Amino acid sequence: IDALDYRPNKAARDLAGRDNYVLGYVYDNPNAYYILAMQNGILKECRSNGYELLIHPCDATNPDIIDELVNMVNSARLAGLILSPPLSEMPDVLQAMDDKGIQYVRVLSGDKAPDDKPCVLVDDYQAARQITGHLLDQGHQRIAFIAGEKQHHSTTERQRGFYQALADHGIQADPELVIDGTYSFGTGVQSIQQLLALPEPPTALFACNDEIAAGALFGARMQGVDVPEALAIAGFENSPFSTQTFPPLTTASQPTAQIAQRATSSLIRSLQARKRKAENHTITADIFVPELIVRESTSR
């Protein structure tokens, strides 16, 4: 087989039995860098295990989202799904998948698995505490926070970590320094204008992702604000945005491709266990803690 460089034909293999060798990645996320990293990680694991990948973008707010997903799984004869936020955090979607017997793995924000189903966790809370703690260690006390969409649990976890770090240093969060937004460059631009217009503007800013932080940096520089001397700015995710700005952004490195690869591996193991009818298959939740990366945007 090795000498002939034989590769099993997926279509023939599917027809020969009842096993399917196609996985689906379903997402609703406007962050192109995140989606690309997820796809690369999933594809790497699929290729290593003889699986194909179907990528399906969707709108999580669509009232027919459950029917859309079930029909997609059935028509494509998918073996299982990889779900990322916010779809991975929607109970009605997960319940529908369970009811239909569709296997899936979730990428979730948190440090503890919510149930015994396959998932990979990202500890956004601890990473946000580290970022905020870094800003506090730099001597900042008026620290602003710009949030992403509330339907993403990562937003609430990062905001919770921000609040906890302030509390750890005996500082009460100022509500006028906390702004709700979306995970977008435009949110950063608009929010920094609002913050800089305050009678006492912040001296530091923690943005919920790098795209928001880049927008805030752009908006601050447009107003002649010196970053980091007058305003320190930190983001989250260590996306290409974080190194394409001037100055480069302090951030938390989130190994998205590795997270996606681990999630895919977990799903494939579950599929193989079902095929073997293994009753003692142990499901473990892998936890990733994003790592603080200090760059010039917060270095005085």
Regions found by a protein language model. Name each.
Residues 28-37, 55-65, 109, 119-130, ...:
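Hinge/beta->alpha junction and helix N-cap segments in small-molecule ligand-binding domains
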